[in-house]
Amino acid sequence: MKVRIRGIYATALTKLFLDNGFEIVQATPQISDRFSLPIRAEPSDVTIKDGNDKGELISIGEDIYSFLRKTFQNSFIWKSPVRLYSVIETNNCKFMDYQVEPCLDKGLVVKPPSEGRIILSSPKAVGKYSMVWRGDGKTFFSEHIRDREEKTRLLSISIPFNKKGYNVKWRSNAPFASNIVLKEELEKLAIRFDNNDFRQQGEDFIKVTVSLEDKIMLDEIRKKVLPNTIRFHHMLKMSFSNEVDEIEQTSMNNEELLDKLITDYMGIEHIKPDGRKFELKEGKVIYKEVNSDYYIVRLMRVFSREGIYDGLNVKKEEGDYDIVEFDSRKWYQIHRYYNKDGKLKGIYVNISTPPELLRGKLRYLDLEVDVVKVGDEVRIIDLEELEKNKEIIGETMYKKIFTIIEEVKKIL
């Protein structure tokens, strides 16, 4: 299988994919140099790249779910139940419990399901290099096709189809195919469109929300190629760019960069298995410890609004505060809630992946289940949410969660 790789994880992923028998195509000059690879200007079967959030990896194309699940055992992995560029038939503006936008009876999936919605466009016949549909007889280009000569070449192939009333959009793989191959695909797609035959089209879309543990795993893989790779390289790359490269070329000391990420007040980003992100109330840093292998950040969060503490079922009052510690070596955070006079009201332990340090905030993947203690009573809550998200969480983390729960119960 031929793989195109882009983004901040490119070196580690290239090593990983090569070691597992994949072929690398369209490598960047830097990657080509690091691995002594020829730059193969060939179409890819699958593209791996950063998501909009550099903490995510996106795979589009052939199905490599099993390989990703085996590799990223401590991360969330979600495979879209609807293939990208497939054509679906809807019912009352819905498909598989997702709302479709716009409300078409039949449409092309142009974005995978997100926040309960699937984004559609009018049906199109989609191939490896192009899309074809009836319209005004125009040619469009992927944003990744920028070379003027290449556009001229592709236009010369699509114009005869434009004259017959077909719109053509050239996809990013098109520059790597010959004129004959491209023309043959357009002919097949035109026939498929006219026959309303969209059965075999579509690409698998997989999202990996990469945990700190798996970023460190990628650090170690990168280190085999570039021995100066520092611990937390990929995590630091989310907040810094050139600074990480400079440190690796000089001092090899990551502590300075880690310390820069810790500000007087730190936000908390709580990521759910379904991809939703929640920004929890920020806290004042009351203790920090940073060295090359780990970091600890302790926060104090003061509450001004009344309410009820989730899970604890204890009243929240003005002046209450929470003391919580984030340790990059631990799979949980213990929240201790006090009233304004310093009396303990309850303890809430959030089970999660070890926390990452980003600029001015901490981030972790929430593993759904939590442990709470009020008085002498210790309870495990939200086990049903864990079961519901077991596939995204994966078997390795699922089993680990129960070990962590027992560890937490002993502490409490």
From Swiss-Prot:
Source domain of life: Archaea
> Under which EC number(s) is this enzyme classified?
3.1.26.-
What GO MF annotations does this protein's record show?
mRNA 3'-UTR AU-rich region binding; RNA endonuclease activity, producing 5'-phosphomonoesters
Per UniProt, which keywords does this protein have?
Answer: Endonuclease, Hydrolase, Nuclease, RNA-binding, rRNA processing
Among Pfam families, the record links this protein to: DUF402
Uppermost EC category? hydrolase
Task: State the InterPro entries in the record.
Answer: DUF402 (IPR007295), FomD-like_sf (IPR035930), Ntdp-like (IPR050212), RNA-bd_FAU-1 (IPR016730)
**GO terms under biological process:** rRNA processing
Q: What family is reported? A: Belongs to the FAU-1 family.
In UniProt terms, what function does this protein have? Probable RNase involved in rRNA stability through maturation and/or degradation of precursor rRNAs. Binds to RNA in loop regions with AU-rich sequences.
Note the HAMAP family from the entry: RNA_binding_AU_1 (MF_01910)
Name of the featured protein? Probable ribonuclease FAU-1
Give the gene symbol: fau-1
